[in-house]
């Protein structure tokens, strides 16, 4: 068998000399250059200030939610358990992208090694897909709470919640591993300028020096599975929720149910809408400037919405924050 392979290989170069020249001139890429916002010149300094402020708001908001949910026993419910997991995932999700982007806004050298680029894409997609799946699970949690309140303790027991959270994380990172393998198994010859502020799929795969149709098709199928399927599941859940809410006799009960669901639905629409715009289309249709603005939405604006809209405006969370701060204040006075 090895002899046959060697013979075939030698014949290929004998009958097709251009392939030999191509192989000799092939230079594999060892690092990428992240162009980011370099075309904006001096505006980058203003962007640095804005993005740094937003990053600190995201970080402080998520840390506050995680801490309050952990410290206040009244929030030890499935809904807030998943909120805490989502906030944790969002914290790491932004940490993978934003610090490097902030550094690049102030530096001339914007290089990232081949391996670091692959790792950045792996963790970014891992946490992003985990968030998508978590939003789907949270939709199911609201469906179980509103449509089946009597069976809710059984449907969303702590054991079930733990398994669902673990399934989201495992599914997210397995899907990410599949996509990253499809991207970085491609040959990258000479072009190394990534027209983006991080190693995103479309921007990197455009640099491959071979046909990428099969890889792109499989990545598209993965995108459908992690974006369209959970979104449709959420839509069906909310149709059932809406039907149940309309049957609630009291106006206060309907208002409270609508308020809880509306905050979740607003985050879902922004997150899935922006992600679908970027990933559920061929790479050939990638338009860098427009796509970069949309990417900013789901890498910065959506993580900003989660703590502000979904949790900090929630009366239970606000009350819990006051209780936690009140306890700390009383402890200081006592000491």
Curated annotation (Swiss-Prot):
The keyword Transmembrane applies. Residues 1-45, 96-119, 181-217, 279-291 are extracellular. Glycans are attached at residue 25. It is found in: Cell membrane. Pfam families: 7tm_4 (PF13853). Residues 67-74, 141-159, 238-257, 313-335 are cytoplasmic. The chain crosses the membrane at residues 46-66, 75-95, 120-140, 160-180, 218-237, 258-278, 292-312. PANTHER family: OLFACTORY RECEPTOR (PTHR26453). Odorant receptor. Belongs to the G-protein coupled receptor 1 family. This is Olfactory receptor 10R2. It comes from Homo sapiens.
């Amino acid at each position: 068998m090895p002899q046959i392979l060697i013979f075939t290989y030698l014949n290929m170069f004998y009958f097709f000399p251009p392939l030999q020249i191509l192989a000799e001139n092939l230079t594999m890429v060892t690092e990428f250059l992240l162009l980011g916002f370099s075309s904006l010149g001096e505006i980058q300094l203003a962007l640095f200030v804005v993005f740094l402020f937003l990053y600190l708001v995201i970080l402080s908001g998520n840390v506050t939610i995680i801490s309050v949910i952990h410290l206040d026993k009244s929030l030890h419910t499935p809904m807030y358990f998943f909120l805490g997991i989502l906030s944790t995932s969002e914290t790491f999700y932004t940490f993978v992208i934003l610090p490097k982007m902030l550094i690049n806004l102030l530096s001339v050298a914007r290089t990232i090694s081949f391996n670091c680029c692959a790792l950045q894409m792996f963790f970014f997609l891992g946490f992003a897909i985990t968030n998508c799946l978590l939003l789907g699970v949270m939709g199911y949690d609201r469906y179980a709470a509103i449509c089946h309140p009597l069976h809710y303790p059984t449907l969303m027991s702590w054991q079930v919640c733990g398994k669902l959270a673990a399934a989201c994380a495992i599914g997210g990172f397995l899907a990410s591993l599949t996509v990253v393998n499809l991207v970085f198994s491609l040959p990258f010859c000479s072009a190394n300028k990534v027209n983006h502020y991080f190693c995103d799929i479309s921007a990197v795969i455009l640099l491959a020096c071979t046909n990428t149709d099969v890889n792109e098709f499989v990545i598209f199928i993965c995108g459908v599975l992690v974006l369209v399927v959970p979104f449709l599941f959420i839509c069906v859940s909310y149709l059932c929720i809406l039907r149940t809410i309309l049957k609630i006799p009291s106006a206060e009960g309907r208002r409270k149910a609508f308020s809880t669901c509306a905050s979740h639905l607003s985050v879902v629409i922004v997150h899935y809408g922006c992600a679908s715009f970027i990933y559920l289309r061929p790479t050939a249709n990638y338009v860098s400037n427009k796509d970069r603005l949309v990417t900013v939405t789901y890498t910065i604006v959506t993580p900003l919405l989660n703590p502000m809209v979904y949790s900090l405006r929630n009366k239970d969370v606000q009350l819990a924050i006051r209780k936690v701060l009140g306890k700390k204040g009383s402890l200081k006075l006592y000491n």
